[in-house]
Amino acid sequence: MEYRLKAYYREGEKPSALRRAGKLPGLMYNRHLNRKVYVDLVEFDKVFRQASIHHVIVLELPDGQSLPTLVRQVNLDKRRRRPEHVDFFVLSDEPVEMYVPLRFVGTPAGVRAGGVLQEIHRDILVKVSPRNIPEFIEVDVSGLEIGDSLHASDLKLPPGVELAVSPEETIAAVVPPEDVEKLAEEAAAEVAEPEVIKKGKEEEEE
């Protein structure tokens, strides 16, 4: 699935002035391209809430170009917690590393026996050609008993998709009920914010 967003070239506009006007400064880049752009902040919010880092966002530019991209980084204002800069990675025919959502299906046998399913990862880092990007990867957990775990190597990847993480990475597990509280405390101690979201300004006020 892909989403579309109007983007405009930046021709000397200062980032601070663009933000005051309700625009979001950004950069679109790859190995062969590096160009400053901006998008409407409200429209970006709408699109990014749906696309996130998992789906292609096609930037529609004023010169008629439509460039497929992935959001690589969003810088947030520390105080207001709203985007103030975005990096778009422009896709080509070369394979790219990206996170693809995992869709868990089935009821584990261990859950029927009183255990609890822990979905440790909701997405997985893969290497894939832009033309083969899957909308999601289905994960069948119905065979998991209490104490069982499912690893990245167990995933049934679509054609053209390769793992970009260790095959031993744990994706899901069925645990006894008494272990749930301990796992919840450990999860709360970890950084909950996605790696793509960064706090603070990184672009100079030109």
From Swiss-Prot:
Residues 184-206 are annotated as: Disordered. Residues 1-91 are annotated as: bL25 domain. One of its GO terms (cellular component) is cytosolic large ribosomal subunit. Changing residue 20 to A: No effect on 5S rRNA/N-terminal bL25 complex formation. One of its GO terms (biological process) is translation. Changing residue 19 to A: Destabilizes formation of the 5S rRNA/N-terminal bL25 complex. Residues 92-206 are annotated as: CTC domain. Changing residue 87 to N/S: No 5S rRNA/N-terminal bL25 complex formed. Part of the 50S ribosomal subunit. Contacts the 5S rRNA. Despite its considerably larger size this protein can substitute for the endogenous E.coli bL25 protein in vitro. This is Large ribosomal subunit protein bL25.
